[in-house]
Amino acid sequence: QNEVEKISYGRWKSFAEDLRLPCYFELGDSFSFKENLAAADALITTSVAEGFGMVFLESQLVRRPLLGRKLPEITSDFENNGIDLSMLYQSLHIPTGFLGKDRIYEDIFSAYCKAIGKLESSEQQKMKAHHALNYILSSGIIDFAMLTPSLQKKIILDVVKNKEKAKSIRQ
């Protein structure tokens, strides 16, 4: 296990368990990789960045649909060679009204300032971030991947409770 991600993983695992979401964790400890793939109805990738993207090929080898984000820097070569990745999405748009633009801005900007605070930062960098974030939010939608974990959890809670919100995101 990746030590850097262990705390975050534990939080997401607890969150899924608390909500009784249909998620399974650590199946690799109980079954072989081949058994897991054979038992799957589909494979899911949650990555927003990849090095090679093995899951994009593995799904084809076991003839299972792959659900998740299309990463053009990885997937374009695969698609150009006949691999069907049509079930992937470019972005998961969340209407900013679900959370409120001010809340989204404050949460993301605060996380950004905390992260760059560990580096040598300047007011100019913060102003650039301020303008970029305002520009992003001006469209009325934001990509789920850009949200902080606390905002992602809020969206998940909302769609679990409110099927209309879930439906509007899927559209």
What positions do the PLM features span?
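Nucleotide-activated donor-binding/catalytic signature segment of Leloir-type glycosyltransferases, i.e.
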Residues: 6-31, 81-98
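Short histidine/acidic/glycine/proline-rich micro-motifs that form metal-
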Residues: 1-3
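Short amphipathic alpha-helical segments and helix-helix/interface helices
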Residues: 9-13, 37, 56-57, 75
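Aromatic "clamp/platform" in nucleotide-sugar-dependent glycosyltransferases that forms part
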Residues: 48
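Short acidic alpha-helix that forms the nucleotide-activated donor recognition element
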Residues: 29-40, 61
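A short hydrophobic beta-strand element within the catalytic core of glycosyltransferases
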Residues: 43-44
